[in-house]
């Protein structure tokens, strides 16, 4: 635990998180040990979240036993924040992706045959409640009523699950749930007031240059500063275009940008890598031309891997 906490503490101090919050987090770690069978679910994410204000708001709410709802546009770091919070709290992470066909059995579990006996095959919500995990409720506004009804009792003061034919499950005191939602996307629905009232809500701001550079430097500490700044500028230019409705958010893809930069390590030219990671994410001819124009202002076609890696 000591080595694990030392790394977390350094990250929090680098983000200039208040010492009072760091102290409470340390107490949380000491109070709630992780059981051996789920220790592999506690891992440091590839990308850590950048942003003091959002981190402090999230940590404070979770320390007080509240659940979080992260709302915001694409590429604002919602899932990165979820993974980072699970890591800094030292809790096993359970990812639950909602879609129109998700029902209560997918969340809690369903009956199955084991050694000629009917037993409950535990779902992610059940396991999260049992082991004190952090449940990531991804795209929660795509959930239908059957799935939402399960969430009501676990998200409010009752903190329990009633399973017909089985015992009542009380949530482990370290259990927390973090929902994410992209508002207004196809297939999504309005969250009802009763469900929203069970969350503390954070509206995720759009990424700025510092936060994009933070992500790129985590992945590519050996990259040329000027090149990484150019890639960050490309992302921000596309973000502005998407905000004003000139393009869709398909090409506004931070994962695609990171993958494109990675591909240049294997000798692929930066412009070809960006073609795969960013430009080709749009399938509309006219939109693709706009994205290509934006790329040409930031990434010269003459660039090679040496311009990025020296």
Where are the language model's segments positioned?
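C-terminal regulatory/interaction module of P-loop NTP-utilizing enzymes
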Residues: 1-310
């Amino acid at each position: 635990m000591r080595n694990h906490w030392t790394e977390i503490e350094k990250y929090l101090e680098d983000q200039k998180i208040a010492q009072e919050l760091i102290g409470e987090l340390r107490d949380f770690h000491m109070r709630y040990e992780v059981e051996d069978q789920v220790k592999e679910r506690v891992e440091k994410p590839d990308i850590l979240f950048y942003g003091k204000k959002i981190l402090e708001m999230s940590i404070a709410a979770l320390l007080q036993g509240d659940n979080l709802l992260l709302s915001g546009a694409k590429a604002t770091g919602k899932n990165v924040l979820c993974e980072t919070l699970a890591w800094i709290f030292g809790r096993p992470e359970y990812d639950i992706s909602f879609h129109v066909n998700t029902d209560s059995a997918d969340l809690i579990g369903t009956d199955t045959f084991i050694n000629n006996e009917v037993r409950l095959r535990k779902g992610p919500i059940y396991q999260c409640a049992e082991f004190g995990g952090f449940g990531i409720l991804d795209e929660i506004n795509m959930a239908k009523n059957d799935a939402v009804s399960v969430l009501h009792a676990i998200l409010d003061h009752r903190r329990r699950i009633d399973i017909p034919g089985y015992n009542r499950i009380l949530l482990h005191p370290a259990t927390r749930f973090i929902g994410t939602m992209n508002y207004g996307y196809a297939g999504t629905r309005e969250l009802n007031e009763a469900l929203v009232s069970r969350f503390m809500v954070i509206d995720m701001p759009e990424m700025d240059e510092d936060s994009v550079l933070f992500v790129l430097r985590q992945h590519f500490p050996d990259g040329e500063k000027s090149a990484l700044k150019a890639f960050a500028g490309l992302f921000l230019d596309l973000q502005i275009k998407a905000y004003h409705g000139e393009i869709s958010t398909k090409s506004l893809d931070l994962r695609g940008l990171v993958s494109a930069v990675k591909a240049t390590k294997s000798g692929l030219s930066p412009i070809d890598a960006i073609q795969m990671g960013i430009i080709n994410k749009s399938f509309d001819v006219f939109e693709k031309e706009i994205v290509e124009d934006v790329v040409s202002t930031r990434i010269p076609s003459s660039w090679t891997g040496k311009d990025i890696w020296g």
